């Protein structure tokens, strides 16, 4: 089920005539792209810096894509997650055309598409390119990257969130991790496994950002029954459920988490876990791929469990790093060639052959999860990753009805700023420079500056 268009908010006013004109200028059929220079030219691709990008996509672009398409030169602009979002929004909102391809996710894609900032991949390219096989994309991921039924960003990888744990440490302590643990159970495990100065009982995101500490915290808030706004768009950050969940998360880190947690997000925690310094780690399912390829010894001792819950049946987030083409960019045909290559079944084959099948970007295609080579190589985490993704429900992320879509975000343009602001306050609470109560009061005040009409798009 695709998110209702009425619930997707615009980031700002963009002239419909200009957007339609740009669309018409780009349109034509064929998988080779829409422009006369579809087989040549230089394209710049803005991407997030993480192992699947820097360790696979970028080198394979040089060794494979540019050899297959010698007339196309690919340049990369690599950013941290927060910097990437700022650079891309500036690029698309001002139509600077600095990037021919942009890496975005389910939060940005429908909002950008509604504003006319993205090329409709379904109509522009996929409709005349049956070899791309968009029907093979995992439904939750494809729906999250669509607007009014059309795909506007092609998924490079998809993810939910889950718990990673060190089986050796659990066995030594006489502990057993359930497949579907509760947060209370996790807290008990962390208390028993914590070895200050040596091994953290649990590692969690603390770095400020709506896609950093707030991504993990939001899943806790949801399963505790909290929400960002009620059905009248009144902020709920100081509600009992939101407060209880935040206190739980912050206290869990401060008591049993890694030192300096307020500076840590995915990349830092991957390193800590790979070094054996985390008894448990709650984060993106895609981390399983990075652990398998980067830390093979730790991979052998790693167990996996679903995202912990409290009052809900499931709580994992839903995300994808995907590739979109800004509306009206030059060399759009070459851009599509790159997007279709990097998100294809053939790319999966290429990665599997070169890096091993456990290294293939997960969470995008149904065919990957029926591939015997992948199932064999990624057996420990393949099925639980797929289960985690399929159990997400961005339209109903918490116990009560909400006026927004999103598990770890709220699908309004104001959330990018609001999520960062609240994330900064939570990072302060984790660092001990303010209390959780102070952090949430500040967050409530920040959310209250927006009127219901602004948030609802009315």
What are these regions, as identified by a protein language model?
Residues 189-192, 232-263, 303, 307:
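Glycine-centered hinge/linker elements that transmit conformational signals in sensory
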Residues 2, 171, 392-458:
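Conserved C-terminal helix/tail region of periplasmic/extracytoplasmic solute-binding proteins
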Residues 147-156, 161, 184-235, 241-242, ...:
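Extracytoplasmic/periplasmic solute-binding protein
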Residues 2-117, 127-133, 262, 311, ...:
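Conserved N-terminal structural module of periplasmic/extracytoplasmic solute-binding proteins
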Residues 119-137, 179, 202, 206-207, ...:
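Short, solvent-exposed loop/beta-turn-alpha elements that line the ligand-binding surface or hinge
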Residues 78-88, 107, 181-188, 260-274:
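Short helix-initiation/N-cap motifs at beta->coil->alpha
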Residues 106-160, 213-216, 303-308, 386-390:
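Hinge/lid segment of periplasmic solute-binding proteins
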Residues 287-298, 311-321, 325-420:
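C-terminal lobe and pocket-closing loops
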């Amino acid at each position: 089920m695709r998110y209702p268009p009425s619930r997707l908010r615009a980031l700002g006013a963009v002239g419909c005539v200009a957007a339609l004109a740009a669309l018409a200028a780009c349109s034509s059929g064929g998988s080779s792209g829409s422009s006369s220079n579809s087989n040549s030219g230089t394209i710049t691709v803005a991407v997030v810096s993480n192992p699947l990008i820097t360790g696979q996509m970028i080198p394979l672009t040089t060794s494979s894509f540019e050899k297959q398409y010698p007339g196309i030169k690919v340049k990369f602009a690599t950013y941290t997650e927060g910097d990437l979002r700022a650079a891309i929004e500036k690029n698309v909102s001002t139509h600077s055309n600095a990037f021919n391809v942009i890496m975005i996710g389910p939060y940005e894609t429908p909002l950008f598409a509604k504003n006319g900032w993205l090329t409709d991949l379904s109509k522009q390219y996929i409709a005349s390119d049956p070899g791309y096989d968009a029907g093979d994309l995992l439904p939750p991921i494809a729906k999250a990257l669509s607007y009014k039924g059309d795909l506007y960003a092609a998924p490079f990888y998809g993810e939910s969130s889950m718990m990673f744990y060190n089986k050796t440490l659990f066995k030594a302590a006489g502990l057993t991790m359930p497949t579907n643990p509760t947060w209370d159970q996790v807290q008990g495990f962390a208390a028993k496994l914590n070895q200050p100065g040596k091994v953290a009982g649990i590692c969690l995101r603390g770095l400020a950002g709506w896609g950093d500490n707030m991504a993990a915290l939001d899943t806790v808030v949801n399963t505790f029954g909290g929400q960002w706004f009620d059905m009248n768009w009144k902020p709920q950050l100081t509600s009992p459920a939101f407060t209880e969940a935040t206190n739980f998360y912050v206290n869990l880190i401060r008591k049993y988490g890694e030192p300096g947690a307020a500076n840590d997000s995915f990349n830092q925690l991957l390193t800590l876990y790979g070094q054996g310094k985390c008894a448990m780690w709650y984060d993106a399912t895609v981390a399983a791929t990075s652990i398998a390829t980067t830390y093979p010894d730790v991979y052998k001792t790693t167990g996996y469990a679903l995202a912990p819950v409290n009052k809900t049946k499931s709580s994992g987030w839903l995300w994808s790093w995907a590739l979109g083409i800004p509306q009206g960019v030059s060399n759009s045909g070459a851009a599509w060639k790159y997007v279709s290559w990097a998100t294809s079944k053939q790319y999966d084959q290429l990665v599997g052959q070169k890096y091993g099948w456990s290294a293939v970007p997960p969470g995008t295609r149904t065919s990957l999860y029926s591939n015997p080579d992948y199932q064999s190589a990624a057996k420990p985490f393949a099925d639980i990753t797929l289960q985690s993704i399929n159990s997400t429900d961005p339209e109903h992320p918490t116990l009560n009805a909400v006026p927004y879509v999103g598990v770890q975000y709220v699908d309004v343009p104001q959330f990018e700023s609001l999520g960062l602001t609240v994330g900064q306050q939570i990072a302060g609470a984790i660092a001990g420079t303010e209390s959780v109560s102070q952090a949430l009061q500040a967050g409530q005040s920040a959310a209250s500056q927006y009127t219901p009409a602004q948030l609802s798009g009315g």
